[in-house]
């Protein structure tokens, strides 16, 4: 793992250590909902919704910001809730293989 990524994860762990688990969980839900709103706005833009009062650049900047917030909160959630890294990686691997097999069959 890249040392910069490890440092970011360690900072996220330190931040999480100073929060109650309920706060971390609630903030993750909040950040996920903000990302969902940003993705919906992108979809509306892609389908030429004339009621949008923003441009493509603004939408993508918002998506980057919300993705960053979600990733930070996921790191804190993993740490605070003692999610096993190995179990998580195993589950990710299984899902990727299953998704890959699905598209390979087409």
Feature-to-residue mapping (PLM):
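Flexible "arm" and connector segments at domain edges
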Residues: 1-67, 71-106
